[in-house]
Amino acid sequence: MTLGTLGSRLTGLVRTWAMAFALGNSLLTSAYQVANNLPNVMYELVAGGFLSAAFLPVLLLEREKHGQEGGNRYTSNILNLTLIVLGLLSLVCCIFAPQVVSTQTFTVGNDAEVAEATTEFFRIFAFQIVFYGLGGVITGVLNAGRSFFLTSIAPALNNVVVIASFIAYIPLSHIDSELALNVLAVGTTAGVAVQFVIQIPALVKSGYHWEPFISLSDPAIKETLKIALPSIIYIVANLVAFTFRNAFSLSATPSGPSILGYAWMWYQLPYGVVAVSLSSTMFTEMSDSVAKGDRAGLLRNINQGLRGTLYLIIPLTGMLFVLSEPLMGLFHAGAFGSSDVTQVASVLSIWVLSLPIYSAAMYLYKAFAAIRKLMAFSLINIACVGVQVGLYAALSQPDVLGIYGVPVGDFVYYLVRGIASLVLLRHYVGAADMRGLVAMGVKTVLATLFGGVIVWALLAVVPLTSTAGIGAALLQIVIGGIVGLVTMFGATKVLRVEEFRVIGSLAAKLKGRARR
């Protein structure tokens, strides 16, 4: 699973590089990004909450009650309903593409060039919706059988197909621009199809056999709806925020969604690699404590998870901040120019300041899921999203902060949501060790500032290379990254941060493997 996830991350980086080379940081890139995100939005809005939050636990329950055949019957019911509903939704979205796209571009109007380009892409991208539904069911069945490799490596195959599409687009764009755009749109949709269709043989091998069965009155369907409702409320609120983010970034600049897309890739990387793994592990521990009625153990796990998340993410945030320009310099090729590097890097350097708060807020979401109080959390999130959307509207105007209004709005949103979550969590399970958490956070921030200054001085005072470009950026990232991380985590040891033992334990394991 780890190898599969790593492969998906690496090919995702190459995919973004290919997009930067082919499209640059332009109006067309914004149109592509918005249109390519819309199928995900529509899928999550209609079926994502059911399939991601409720399908797996109900499937396991049906297998426990009625055996493999009962599980197959429930799966067929969900699969058939999903394909019918999402198939119709794909068709409707294709026909009414301008109206759907207007939900993301209402700040610039339907006649704007970016809206028209987004519409043309989305007419083809709309058919991704049904494949996302198919994938949601397949992934649930395979995960129920603890088969994780194919589901983790499949996104890499998607990325490979899309990379090939970008490569094909480059020469075609000089011959027939309309054909080039169609190839890119079809290739991107084909990538999503490949990602999930490639898993069908594993689905069959797992023991599943399809049945032509549909029943809305099935008790298992009602249980699915009951479990999924809090997640659906949470998802809908976040999708509203995502819609306004797109719309107000477009009002700031036509390349707004493009800028945010490139910056978001680096923003998400440390969270996806480090924080998600930790929160997934701690979710199991928290759930186990809840099942045993061990409130002290639950509080201990919540506290340990928060401390561990912040300890690992704060230094990585510092590295993203100080290396923001070299990181974006990796895309300095083709249509992605030096001005694009500077612009996206400046947005990333501001946005990344909210990364520790974002990671902590997402961890607290897991805590609420473990104690089965997601409904209360979701209702609080609605109020916080209202604040977030209001800040987007107020700050993202060209004469205020422009595109920088989005990261500032997100910082406030995650801060408010995090504080509200801690207050609500205290109501349900008691107070966490806030004094120890704050002390650890302050020490880690000081260590990060110390290491960040050293890396900044290294890059500014002692030039690592006299030439610009991808090679120079890579050299700065490697040398600056090694020096920075060693200095930052080393400083936490000097400051006696307890969580340093996590790094020490990891280093010992790696040393042991190297000896073997």
Q: Where are the regions a protein language model picked out?
A:
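Membrane-embedded alpha-helical bundles of multi-pass transporters/translocases
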Residues: 1-516
